[in-house]
Amino acid sequence: MAITVTAKQVKELRDRTAAGMMDCKKALVEAEGDLELAIENMRKSGAVKAAKKAGRVAAEGVILAKVEGSVALLAEVNCETDFVAMDKSFLAFANKIAEIALANKVASVEALNELAYDGDTVEVARANLVSKIGENISIRRLHIVEGENLGAYVHSGKIGVISVLKGGDADLSKDIAMHVAAAAPQYVKAEDVPADVVAKEKEIQLAIAVESGKPEAIAEKMVAGRMAKFSGEVSLTSQPFIKDPSIKVAKLLKDAGAEVISFIRLEVGEGIDKKVEDFAAEVAATMAASAK
């Protein structure tokens, strides 16, 4: 006997799962109208869909930065396309897991996945969202930091920074975070640059100078100048302050009686090999296949 599924049942299932209308109707028919069984089955199928999509490259997404008192969080949540990175459901999930991680001071993705999320776990919520949206979604990395004066800045959801200062005020820590986002220093001070990094850069600069045909003595002087510039470029305190290039960050901090202890800077997709789609070739291949 065929099971009749009402519009009210479909709506209730949609409200509870956020899945598509046809998926809800199909699940209710298969569960013979049992709402709870339909939800259970959809979660199972959602997990299967999520597993199938797990191997796909997720290099787009959003960076989130949150500060609560003396604790701050910086996180990256990835998806496959920039379109989904702007999706309300994706952003709601990303913001909620950031709040959960901050509240529990969790900096491990594995530990976060086990925490509660609307009656389920974060991992189940992620799998359900993969099923709904149709893209691989991953919580890539989390950082929890504690400090006296924490600053947070996110630029267009793509670059995020947490700055940790001793002294100064909230405006200063935010300005430092904003500067780090824009100037991308790698170290706090010039003396923090590791010796092997300096040696490698010197080797590169010397090779460039020699290749240009300069005499060795002149090449050495050129390299010395370039190395001084290199240390200034990669260290925060040696950089011109982004909001007032007439002063260095070091002077800004000194005048405020403050010190930068550390900073963390994340950029969406950094270090991930993105697949470059050749849509023209894809269309040509599809047309060639259909012509056979």
From Swiss-Prot:
<keyword id="KW-0963">Cytoplasm</keyword>
<keyword id="KW-0251">Elongation factor</keyword>
<dbReference type="InterPro" id="IPR001816">
    <property type="entry name" value="Transl_elong_EFTs/EF1B"/>
</dbReference>
<dbReference type="InterPro" id="IPR014039">
    <property type="entry name" value="Transl_elong_EFTs/EF1B_dimer"/>
</dbReference>
<comment type="function">
    <text>Associates with the EF-Tu.GDP complex and induces the exchange of GDP to GTP. It remains bound to the aminoacyl-tRNA.EF-Tu.GTP complex up to the GTP hydrolysis stage on the ribosome.</text>
</comment>
<dbReference type="Pfam" id="PF00889">
    <property type="entry name" value="EF_TS"/>
</dbReference>
<comment type="similarity">
    <text>Belongs to the EF-Ts family.</text>
</comment>
<protein>
    <recommendedName>
        <fullName>Elongation factor Ts</fullName>
    </recommendedName>
</protein>
<dbReference type="GO" id="GO:0005737">
    <property type="term" value="C:cytoplasm"/>
</dbReference>
<dbReference type="InterPro" id="IPR036402">
    <property type="entry name" value="EF-Ts_dimer_sf"/>
</dbReference>
<keyword id="KW-0648">Protein biosynthesis</keyword>
<feature type="region of interest" description="Involved in Mg(2+) ion dislocation from EF-Tu">
    <location>
        <begin position="81"/>
        <end position="84"/>
    </location>
</feature>
<dbReference type="InterPro" id="IPR009060">
    <property type="entry name" value="UBA-like_sf"/>
</dbReference>
<dbReference type="GO" id="GO:0003746">
    <property type="term" value="F:translation elongation factor activity"/>
</dbReference>
